[in-house]
UniProtKB/Swiss-Prot annotation:
Pfam families: Ank_2, Ank_4, SOCS_box. Probable substrate-recognition component of a SCF-like ECS (Elongin-Cullin-SOCS-box protein) E3 ubiquitin-protein ligase complex which mediates the ubiquitination and subsequent proteasomal degradation of target proteins. May play a role in the regulation of cell proliferation and autophagy by promoting the ubiquitination and degradation of SQSTM1. The SOCS box domain mediates the interaction with the Elongin BC complex, an adapter module in different E3 ubiquitin-protein ligase complexes. Signal peptide: none annotated. Belongs to the ankyrin SOCS box (ASB) family. GO terms for cellular component: cytoplasm. Binds APS. Identified in a complex with ELOB and ELOC. Interacts with CUL5 and RNF7. Interacts with SQSTM1. PROSITE patterns: ANK_REP_REGION, ANK_REPEAT, SOCS. This is Ankyrin repeat and SOCS box protein 6. The keyword Cytoplasm applies. Keywords: ANK repeat, Cytoplasm, Repeat, Ubl conjugation pathway. The keyword Repeat applies. Residues 358-413 form the SOCS box domain. It comes from Mus musculus (Mouse).
Length: 418
C-alpha cells in the first residue's frame, strides 16, 4: 500500500537525516519545542551547523527526501532562514507529507506562518495547488480560521486565484462561510478580505450551495438552538449579509430555500432586523428571477399573520402585527407603483382578524388608485437615501419633524390615500 510504504520510508530511510537536520537547529521535539534563541549570533551559528551537515550528507541515499521532509518541519515552525538553506540544498517544494499529503505551503498556512508562505511562493511553490485528500488550496485553508488572516492577506498579495474552485465548485469564499459558526469561529474579516480581493458572490457549488447557504443554516440554528448563542449568531449573520450585499450579492434569487429574503419573510418576527436591513438595502421582496409568480413577500407576510389566530390579550400576536405593518410598509415604499400578487387572498381568524383585513384592504386600495403625490415623494426620498440605514439618514435631514415622521418606515398611515 502506498500509504504504508511512505510511512516506512520515513522510519527506515530518510528519518535519520531529518532528525540530524532538526538537531543541528536545536530542535529536539516538535510537539514540545521551546522558542529558539533568535539572537543574530545564535541563528547564524545554527545555520552554519546546518550548512555543514548538508554538505556532509549531500551524497547520502535518500538525501532529497530527507531535506524535503525537513522543509515541512521548517514550514510548521516558521524558520525561514533554515527553509531557505534547505531549498538551496535541493529540497523539493512539491514534496508531500506522507500522512496528510500536505505540501510545505499548505503546512505554513495551517500554522499561520505568512513569512514562510512568501518565501515558498517566491521560490516557486504553486500558490493554487490543491492537496490530494481534501482538494484544499492554500487560500481555502487560510480562509477557514480567523487566526490565519495574515496568511490570507499574504496569499492574495502574492497573486492567489481568489475564485479558484475545487471539483465541487467550492471557492475560498464558500470555505470561509461554511467554516463559520457565528459563536466560536467568526470569519467576518476573512470574508471581507476575500470580497475586497474580488471573490465572486455568485459562486455556487454543484450541490447548489451559495454564499447565503451558511447564513440560512445559522439562522435556523437560532430558532431551536442555545438561546444564549442566538444573539451572537444573529449579529454574525447580519454583519456578513452587509458585506455580501455591499459586493453585489442577490438575496432574493431562486430557489426559495436558498433565498435569504424568502427565509426572513417567512419568519419575519424572528428575523425582523435582518429583513428590514435587506428591504432597506434594495433586496427584492419577490423572486428576483421570476417575480411574484414564483414567490411574493406580500403572500408570505399575510400567510404568517393568518396562521397565528391569537387573542385580544396576546402580546405576541400584537407584536407580530406591528412587525408585519413595518415590513409591508418597507415593501410599499420600495417602488413607486404598488403591484400586489394576483393570488393574494386572505382568511384571517381570531380577534385581530379585522385589523388584518383592514391592512389587506388598505394595500388593495393603494394599488387600485394612482399613487398620491406624497407617496411618490416618500418613495423617491427613501430610494435616494439607500442603502441601509435609511431611517437614520432620514432623521439627519434638515426637514421639519412632522415630515421626517412621515418619511420614516412604518410611521405613515397606509390607509391614507389622499
Amino acid at each position: 500500500m502506498p500509504f504504508l510504504h511512505g510511512f516506512r520510508r520515513i522510519i527506515f530511510e530518510y528519518q535519520p537525516l531529518v532528525d540530524a537536520i532538526l538537531g543541528a537547529l536545536g530542535i529536539q521535539d516538535l510537539e514540545r519545542q521551546e522558542p529558539l534563541d533568535d539572537s543574530a549570533s545564535s541563528e547564524e551559528s545554527r545555520i552554519l551547523v546546518l550548512t555543514e551537515l548538508l554538505e556532509q550528507k549531500a551524497h547520502s541515499p535518500f538525501y532529497q527526501e530527507g531535506v524535503s521532509n525537513a522543509l515541512l518541519k521548517m514550514a510548521e515552525l516558521g524558520l525561514t532562514r533554515a527553509a531557505a538553506v534547505l531549498l538551496q540544498s535541493g529540497a523539493n517544494l512539491n514534496f508531500e507529507d506522507p500522512v496528510t499529503y500536505y505540501t510545505a505551503l499548505h503546512i505554513a498556512v495551517l500554522r499561520n506562518q505568512p513569512d514562510m508562505v512568501e518565501l515558498l511562493v517566491r521560490h516557486g511553490a504553486d500558490i493554487n495547488r490543491r492537496d490530494r485528500i481534501h482538494e484544499s488550496s492554500p487560500l481555502d485553508l487560510a480562509s477557514e480560521e480567523p487566526e490565519r488572516l495574515p496568511c490570507l492577506q499574504r496569499l492574495l498579495d502574492l497573486g492567489a486565484d481568489v475564485n479558484a474552485a475545487d471539483k465541487n465548485g467550492k471557492t475560498a469564499l464558500l470555505h470561509a462561510l461554511a467554516s463559520s459558526d457565528g459563536v466560536q469561529i467568526h470569519n467576518t474579516e476573512n470574508i471581507r478580505l476575500l470580497l475586497e480581493g474580488g471573490a465572486d458572490v455568485k459562486a455556487t457549488t454543484k450541490d447548489g450551495d451559495t454564499v447565503f447557504t451558511c447564513i440560512i443554516f445559522l439562522l435556523g440554528e437560532t430558532v431551536c438552538g442555545d438561546k444564549e448563542e442566538a444573539p451572537m449568531i444573529n449579529r454574525f449573520c447580519f454583519q456578513v449579509t452587509q458585506l455580501l450585499l455591499a459586493h453585489g450579492a442577490d438575496p432574493s434569487e431562486c430557489p426559495a430555500h436558498e433565498s435569504l429574503t424568502h427565509i426572513c419573510l417567512k419568519s419575519f418576527k424572528l428575523h425582523f432586523p435582518l429583513l428590514c436591513f435587506l428591504l432597506e438595502s434594495g433586496a427584492a421582496y419577490n423572486c428576483s428571477l421570476h417575480g411574484a409568480s414564483c414567490w411574493s413577500g406580500f403572500n408570505l407576510v399575510f400567510e404568517r399573520l393568518c396562521s397565528h389566530p391569537g387573542c385580544a390579550e396576546d402580546d405576541s400576536h400584537i407584536e407580530l402585527l406591528h412587525k408585519a405593518e413595518t415590513v409591508l410598509d418597507l415593501m410599499v415604499t420600495s417602488s413607486q407603483r404598488l403591484q400586489l400578487p394576483e393570488n393574494l387572498n386572505i382568511h384571517p381568524v381570531g380577534s385581530l382578524a379585522g385589523k388584518i383585513q383592514a391592512l389587506h384592504a388598505s394595500l388593495r386600495q393603494l394599488e387600485s388608485y394612482p399613487p398620491p403625490l406624497k407617496h411618490l415623494c416618500r418613495v423617491s426620498i427613501r430610494l435616494c437615501l439607500r442603502p441601509w440605514p435609511v431611517d437614520t439618514k432620514v432623521k439627519a435631514l434638515p426637514l421639519p419633524d412632522r415630515l421626517k415622521w412621515y418619511l420614516l418606515s412604518a410611521h405613515s398611515d397606509t390607509q391614507d390615500t389622499c
